[in-house]
Every structure is written in C-alpha cells, then in structure tokens.
Amino acid sequence: MKKDMGPLLALYPMPATVVGAESNGKVNWLMVAHVGIIGHDRLMVSMHKAHHTNQMVKDSRRLSVNMVDEGMLRRADYVGCVSGAKTDKQGVFAHHTGPGGTPVIDESPLAMECEVTDNYETDTFDNFICRVTHTIADENVTDDKGKPDYNRLKPVLFNMPGYSYLRTGDVICRCTLPGREYARETDGDN
C-alpha cells in the first residue's frame, strides 16, 4: 500500500555542485544542489534569494557550475554553510578564470561555464536560466570519445529528504536497452 506523503519534493538525489560567481573583482562560491537540465544547451540553477551570490550572478550574468567529488566535499559543504556577505570564500578553492570569464575550481573534475539568459523568480528563489558556453573536464574523467565518464568522475549526490550526501552507484545498463527488450518481448504492441 502506498502512503500519501503530502507535497514532498522527492526528485532526489541531485548532483552536488559549487556555483562560482565574480562581481567587482571578487569571487564567491556557493554549494547548490538544485541544478537541472532544461534543454540540450540549457540548465537552471535554483538559489534561495537570501544568498549573497545571487546578486553577484545578477550583476555579471555569468556563473560556473563545478561538480563536487569526495575530495572537495568538506570545503564545498562549508561554502554552503557560510554567507559570502560575512565571510570571504574566495580562497577556499584554488581557481582560475575559464574561457567564458567565470571562476572555475581547479580541482573540480568537471565544470560548466554559463551565461545567464533569464531569471524566473518565485517568492523565495531565483531560478537562473543558463546557457552552457564551455564544459571543462579533467582528462582522467572522460571516456575514449572525450565524453564525461561518471564511473570515473564519481560526483557527490545530495539527498534533500534525508539531508545527506551520497556516492554514485554502478551503471545498470545503457539507456533504451530495457525498452527495446520489452518491445521485442511484447512484439512492440505498446
């Protein structure tokens, strides 16, 4: 029997990321797990309006999304616990300016530089609509075709209902394989 859990947001886990922003020569970092794909070249970064980083993103119209692995988790969690309005977080991560002009964390295994094209505001959140301009990955986390290999990347995942971090799991199978097998078994009647 299923139980009604009320209006619980249960689309988790999500990748843990650190958003980088720069405004007036100052870099700030913020742990953000509410990042989602909304098109083949677009993503949305959803940040509570109380965050100091939001105004920096609004000013520059650019941000970086840095994937978090276990080696950087303590510092990534830290930049989500303290406000950039009160704490200078610029030196928490060694970083460089990426080709798109955003601060990129050196040790992040994969980072995306983004141009902010829109902001969909709700009562409490800025939802930045972003166009990915550059994706930068360490060579040791890519496959032989140069695409990200998440078994090598091992991104940290965030689970909101349990308020915890998770490790990524094993590959179950290639996408579309189960559906094609099912179609063959049912003679494609569905």
Task: List PLM regions with ranges.
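Basic, polyanion-binding surface patches
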Residues: 1-190
